[in-house]
Amino acid sequence: LLDAQFDLLQSARFPVIILLAGVDCAGKGETMNLLHEWMDPRHIESHAQRELTDEERERPSMWRYWRDLPPKGKIGIFIGSWYSSPLIDNVQGRTKNAELDQQLDRIIRFETMLCNEGALILKFWLHLSEENQKKRLKKLEKDPKTSWRVKDTDWKNYKMYDRLRLV
């Protein structure tokens, strides 16, 4: 990986965009940390997208990602990619299927534009069984060093495991 990263940096022909998505506790953060260990972190830009800010709500939906895209020759890692909000909003009943379809169409157009501009997009979905997800949530919750990571929304999403898997 390190050699490939330096080849990318030297050629500066295209940016690499890595999307890490998946169920809660599947290891997205750990995967990002490993990539930082295996490659030169000076040339990796990592972004963990959370709740929309007031400014982001006033802008087009892809703006928050657009401004964080890596330049040619660099790597950008996104946790909580542009797929996260549309999927969670649909699973939690905040949007209907028709709106999800529209959002997915916008995402496809966004990714197509990035690819047409030469970007390489690598998308990874990290999965856990429902049982293993529950075990990891409980383990994180019990440990005083990691309990802060488990929020009410994590348990709310866990209860919607089957619906999220279908979407």
Listing of model-derived features with the role each one plays in the protein:
Residues 2-167:
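Glycine-rich phosphate-binding loop of ATP-dependent small-molecule kinases
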